[in-house]
Amino acid sequence: MKTLLLTLVVVTIVCLDLGYTRTCLISPSSTPQTCPQGQGICFLKAQCDKFCSIRGPVIEQGCVATCPQFRSNYRSLLCCTTDNCNH
């Protein structure tokens, strides 16, 4: 009986995740915000457009469910899973 009760408690904790959600820096202001449910990965993407040599790369930060694929116009792409790690 104790084993069954312990199993139920563990399953409940895992399923509910104790209400914890990820916080990531969100562009354009780079302020920490709580990510929507299911989006537990922070990302930082720097990409170049035709004005990159003048103003530098365009920076995008946010929350995603899966890390975006790297593309040829990206200068860098960072995906991470700790709070506010995308700086």
Curated annotation (Swiss-Prot):
Annotated Pfam families: Toxin_cobra-type
Predominant localisation class: secreted
CC terms in the record's Gene Ontology section: extracellular region
Keywords, alphabetical: Acetylcholine receptor inhibiting toxin, Disulfide bond, Ion channel impairing toxin, Neurotoxin, Postsynaptic neurotoxin, Secreted, Signal, Toxin
Protein's UniProt keywords contain Disulfide bond: yes
Tissue: Expressed by the venom gland.
GO molecular function, one term: toxin activity
Purpose: Postsynaptic neurotoxin that binds and inhibits neuronal nicotinic acetylcholine receptors (nAChR) with high affinity (IC(50)<100 nM). Is a selective, and slowly reversible antagonist of alpha-3/CHRNA3-containing and some alpha-4/CHRNA4-containing AChRs.
Protein family membership: Belongs to the three-finger toxin family. Long-chain subfamily. Kappa-neurotoxin sub-subfamily.
Record text on subunit structure and interactions: Homo- and heterodimer; non-covalently linked.
Name this protein carries in UniProt: Kappa 1b-bungarotoxin
Source organism of this protein record: Bungarus candidus (Malayan krait)
